[in-house]
Amino acid sequence: MDIPEDVIYLEPSAGGGSFLDLLPRYVALDIAPEDERIEKQDYLKYETEKTDFITIGNPPFGKRSKLAIDFFNKAAKMSDVIAFIVPVSFMKWSVQKNLDFNFALNSYTYLEPESFSSNGEPYSVRTVFQVWVKKGSQYDNGINLRLTKQPPISHPDFEIW
């Protein structure tokens, strides 16, 4: 993906600022920032006129991924690209059907279960890094790995539900 030098990145759940050293220009938000470069702000209440951010982060998951879905859909209003570390449930139709349909799943990479730490100890959580691209944007390359319909729940040999 070719990214213009003047792009501004948005990190909506910046926490300790893990991504910030890698980003040339950014807006970083968190409700409990752990780094002076991060603005104390509830992302879900954040307002901006800008609509072409590249949003990158590791949003809070919430019960049944609800918070992560809310973060995604908020990002969809102000971004051309959304690159999030999310629960593996984001690979399922039951989650993808709730995400803004103006976005195509461009790529994904499953992360190692112990990619995170908590209090200095490895923390096991099943996650995937997904890159979503707004359809028709300058980043749209025609790739769409998104599930566009519910998978079948029956088979000649058995029925799932």
Region annotations inferred by a language model:
Residues 1-161:
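Class I S-adenosyl-L-methionine-dependent methyltransferase catalytic core
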